[in-house]
């Protein structure tokens, strides 16, 4: 699929396999997600704009590169997006943070918004939306649609797992938004869960049921 980037680095795939195991503890699951998120941050930010500035080293003055423009914004889809957000902030500590609160209606599987908070000057910022699972795609589509109302410079979507159904939904609604994922699993089940998947990411991150 166009505009879909599979992050197949061996370290990412190894850690993802460990996360999939049903006997992985909450602590292990959370730690592994943090580590994968740091590795994925490297991939998703590789085309960020740069500018030259003058830097004085201990030996001489030189021209060196820094990231150009307003601070990047990482947008977490609550609640599970927090798991990816923490790892990415380790790599990009200067990023601004936004939150979108969405829950999935268990009957219709549609996304319902209950919270929305973003930094200022969004029209001058690049945005990375994070959520561990791109399953039905409804939450991702709703989040991106809401963000587009603020006219950011660009939007990317990062997830741990997705499936053909979720990707199709996302690409139909937002073909201009690149999706970065560690795996494309087989399918959705009738309850909207990815198969073979890794279960409910939010429950496994926070130790809830």
Swiss-Prot record:
Catalytic reaction equation(s): UMP + diphosphate = 5-phospho-alpha-D-ribose 1-diphosphate + uracil
Co-factor note (free text): Binds 1 Mg(2+) ion per subunit. The magnesium is bound as Mg-PRPP.
EC number, as in UniProt: 2.4.2.9
Name recorded for this polypeptide: Uracil phosphoribosyltransferase
Residue ranges that the Swiss-Prot or TrEMBL entry lists as coiled coil: none
Chain positions recorded as 5-phospho-alpha-D-ribose 1-diphosphate binding sites: 79, 104, 131-139, 200
Named cofactor requirement(s): Mg(2+)
Record lineage: Bacteria, Pseudomonadati, Pseudomonadota, Betaproteobacteria, Burkholderiales
Residues that, per the record, bind uracil: 194, 199-201
Keywords: Allosteric enzyme, Glycosyltransferase, GTP-binding, Magnesium, Nucleotide-binding, Transferase
Broad enzyme group: transferase
Any one Gene Ontology BP term: UMP salvage
Functional pathway: Pyrimidine metabolism; UMP biosynthesis via salvage pathway; UMP from uracil: step 1/1
Activity regulation description: Allosterically activated by GTP.
Recorded GO MF terms: GTP binding; magnesium ion binding; uracil phosphoribosyltransferase activity
Annotated function: Catalyzes the conversion of uracil and 5-phospho-alpha-D-ribose 1-diphosphate (PRPP) to UMP and diphosphate.
Listed Pfam families: UPRTase
């Amino acid at each position: 699929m166009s505009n879909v980037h599979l992050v197949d680095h061996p370290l990412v795939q190894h850690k993802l396999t460990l996360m999939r195991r049903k006997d992985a503890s909450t602590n292990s699951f959370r730690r592994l997600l943090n580590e994968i998120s740091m590795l994925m941050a490297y991939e998703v930010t590789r085309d960020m704009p740069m500018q030259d500035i003058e830097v004085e080293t201990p030996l001489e003055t030189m021209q060196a590169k820094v990231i150009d423009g307003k601070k990047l914004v990482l947008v977490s889809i609550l609640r599970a997006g927090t798991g990816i957000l923490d790892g990415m902030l380790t790599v990009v500590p200067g990023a601004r943070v936004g939150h979108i609160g969405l829950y999935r209606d268990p009957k219709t599987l549609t996304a319902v918004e209950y919270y929305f908070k973003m930094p200022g000057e969004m029209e001058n910022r690049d945005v990375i939306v994070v959520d561990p699972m791109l399953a039905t795609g409804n939450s991702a589509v709703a989040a991106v649609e809401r963000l587009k109302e603020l006219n950011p410079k660009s939007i990317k979507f990062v997830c741990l797992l997705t499936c053909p159904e979720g990707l199709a939904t996302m690409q139909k609604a937002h073909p201009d938004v690149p999706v970065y994922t560690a795996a494309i699993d087989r399918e959705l089940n009738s309850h909207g869960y990815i198969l073979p998947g890794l279960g409910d990411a939010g429950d496994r991150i926070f130790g809830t049921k």
